[in-house]
Structures are given as C-alpha cells and as structure tokens.
C-alpha cells in the first residue's frame, strides 16, 4: 500500500490547522488514554477555567498535553532525535509518570497483550529513529515512528501521547495534516494496536491510521472552489 500525503499544506497552514483544532486533538488524545472527559471540560481545563467532575490527575494530563503541543510548535524544523523525544516527554508526563524525560529503566507489562517491551537502550533507540527517518514518504514515516514509539514503550508512562505528538511534528513539517484518532475509532484502534504489539501486524496498523486517523484541510482546493463561486475566503 502507498501512503501518499492526503493533504498538501504549507508548514504555516498546517500549524494553523493544529492550533485551530488544538482542543479537539487534546480531547481525543485524552480519550485515547481512557480519560473520561468531555470536550467542554477539556476546553475549560485548557483555558484555566473552573471545572467540576474531573480528577486532579486527569486535569494534569490535559494541561501537560497543552504544554507538549506548544513544545512541538516550538520545535518545528529542529532535529528529530532521542533528545527531542525525551524533552517532549518531560512536557507530556511531568509530575505524572514515575520519571519524565528519561528512558524507562525496568520491565513492565502492557494490558491486553502478552507482549513485554524490552528495556530501551539509548544507542539502540537513536539508531531506530535514524532508520525510521529514512522512510521517503513523510506520512508513512510519521505513522511508523508513532507506532514504533507506542510499541517500544520508551518511557514509564505517556507513550501513546508522546509518540503521536512526535509523529505530528513530522506531519506538520511536511504539511501532511494531523494524526488524531476519532472517538468512533478508539475501540478499533486499541484492538489493532494490541494485535500489533502481540503479532507485529505493522501494515494492518499503518493502514488503519492512514485510512481513519489523519485530519487536515486542502487549502488549495478550498480556495479554488471559493474563487469559482466568487467568494472571499474567510481566513
């Protein structure tokens, strides 16, 4: 299967899309982690408004995601390497994980699968990143880096969030859109992810993400349509 870019935006346009929909992306990331929070509650937390019915730990995770996204925006155009992943994790899992910003140093089990990820070694992680960065197509490269990060479980916690944000750095830098799992696909995504962990079904996982989990805007097509209708773009 080919993983040609679904969207062809400039970096600035892709950043605009990400910032415009940031609450939605953070909300969906929270839901992916099993946080039972509504969109209005997520918005209130991000805006530092008073919110009821959400655990303090969950508020922290959502706030950390906000800071992590800002770190991604600030890192556009900078190298993708182990230092970036660790610095990103410092934002994703601050005051939440056993350690943040440092590679996992012990074994643990992943719920729903018999797969036990090996303890990561810095040199092997950096080699894997360099190998993945050679994938020619940026969309495929982003998806593979995300799935690799999730399966590798580089950190004690926050691996899904960290891996998806790292993938979105590459997506944005290439104007390819944003990877985000829709709520209606959460159950299926987790099922496919568990199968990937257990049976190494990488292609199946890649295809699902490509078909169902990429968001964006085709600005060129939209602008052409508006010009045909003699309308002024509302931008």
Regions found by a protein language model. Give the residues of each.
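FIC/Doc superfamily catalytic core
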Residues: 1-235
């Amino acid at each position: 299967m080919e993983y040609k870019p679904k969207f062809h935006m400039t970096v600035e346009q892709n950043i605009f899309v990400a910032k415009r929909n940031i609450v939605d992306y953070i909300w969906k990331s929270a839901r992916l982690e099993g946080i039972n929070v509504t969109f209005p509650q997520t918005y209130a937390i991000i805006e530092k408004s008073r919110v009821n019915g959400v655990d303090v730990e969950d508020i922290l995770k959502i706030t950390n995601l906000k800071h992590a996204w800002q770190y991604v925006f600030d890192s556009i155009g900078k190298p993708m390497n182990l230092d970036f992943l660790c610095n990103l994790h410092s934002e994703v899992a601050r005051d939440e994980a056993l350690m943040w910003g440092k590679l996992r140093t012990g074994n643990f089990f992943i719920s729903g699968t018999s797969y036990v990820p090996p303890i990561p070694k810095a040199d092997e992680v950096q080699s894997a990143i360099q190998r993945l960065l050679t994938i020619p197509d940026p969309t495929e490269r982003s998806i593979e880096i995300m799935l690799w990060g999730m399966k590798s479980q580089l950190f004690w916690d926050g691996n899904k969030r960290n891996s998806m944000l790292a993938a979105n750095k590459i997506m944005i830098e290439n104007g390819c859109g944003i990877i985000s799992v829709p709520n209606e696909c959460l159950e299926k995504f987790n099922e496919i992810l568990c199968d990937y962990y257990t049976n190494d079904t990488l292609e199946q996982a890649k295809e699902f993400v490509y078909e169902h989990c990429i968001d964006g805007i085709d600005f060129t097509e939209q602008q052409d349509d508006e010009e045909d209708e003699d309308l002024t773009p509302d931008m």
